[in-house]
A protein has these predicted regions:
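Short alpha-helical scaffolding segments that buttress acidic/His motifs in well-ordered protein cores
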Residues: 101-105, 137-148, 192, 217, ...
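Catalytic Zn2+-binding segment of zinc metalloproteases
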Residues: 33, 38-41, 171-180
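A glycine/threonine-rich phosphate-anchoring loop and its flanking beta-alpha core
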Residues: 31-125
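Short glycine/serine- and small hydrophobic-enriched flexible loop segments
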Residues: 35, 103, 174, 193-201
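Oxyanion-binding "anion nests"
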Residues: 123-178
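Small-residue-rich helix-loop
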Residues: 186-194
Length: 250
């Protein structure tokens, strides 16, 4: 209400423009406000975190959290322009880099085996902010995401593959009351392992795929993200939070 009232008090109209400068939350809120203000005004997204540049700024999803779950209130609304400048990333901590890297790895797993092979060799360079590797990874991630978005804008089927890792991830975040102790990216990294293990049990993927993913985690000191959620008790504690996930169809 505060943001909407601010626009109204300044006499914004449908020919005006909202500019978002910040991370994923900033972009989500700005996009959602732009989508409902006078039934929609234009907005530009300038993401300043790696996570936002490779994921939330691309695809037109906007959303806010509620006490019942993550991103349960939102809309599909495309920005007129997205500007990703890698110089913003120079100030990010390793924890923030891991956040964005999780989505980069996810994109490689769901779509591009050659990109995955490249990440097996270059993940360390990305986390160390080497500009050449970082720029390539951002561009490649955006191309993969837009491949799915352009074919299923409103997430009726194909686009749902972009949620790989996120069912368990959102449950982990809710269970931990969205604590800063575990970031979205860390939760996604955990979720991808749990969901790959489940896929192996259901004979959807092979043990070799799981081991290759785990090897990337091990080599880049990311195994901590899933180890504390790998026992039966921890997984059982997540089940109640899976039931209200917005991706459920039954």
């Amino acid at each position: 209400n505060r943001y909407l009232n601010n626009l109204l008090s300044k006499n914004f109209n449908r020919s005006d423009l909202v500019i978002s400068l910040g991370g994923g939350i900033t972009g989500d809120v700005a996009g959602f406000v732009a989508s409902i203000f006078k039934r929609g005004i234009n907005f530009i997204n300038i993401p300043t975190t790696l996570l936002a540049q490779v994921d939330s700024a691309v695809g037109g999803k906007t959303g806010i959290n509620s006490i019942h779950g993550k991103n349960l209130i939102g809309s599909f609304y495309q920005p007129k322009l997205v500007i990703s400048d890698t110089t913003f990333i120079n100030s990010l901590s390793r924890k923030e880099m891991v956040c964005g890297y999780a989505e980069i790895l996810k994109h490689s797993i769901i779509k591009d085996k050659n990109f995955f092979k490249w990440l097996e060799k270059n993940s360390k360079a990305i986390l160390e902010k080497k500009n050449s590797e970082l720029t390539y990874a951002i561009k490649k991630s955006c191309l993969i995401k837009t491949h799915f978005v352009n074919r299923d804008v409103n997430e009726k089927g194909l686009r749902m593959i972009l949620n790989f890792g996120h069912t368990f991830a959102h449950a982990i975040e809710i269970k931990n009351n969205f604590s800063k102790k575990i970031t979205h990216g860390e939760a996604v990294l955990s979720g991808m392992i749990l969901e790959t293990k489940l896929s192996e049990l259901k004979k959807i993927c092979t043990r070799n795929i799981l081991e290759r993913i785990k090897k990337i985690y091990l080599e880049n000191h990311l195994s901590y993200t899933y180890k504390k959620f790998s026992n039966k008790n921890s997984i059982s504690n997540l089940l109640p939070f899976l039931k209200n996930d917005k991706k459920n169809n039954d």
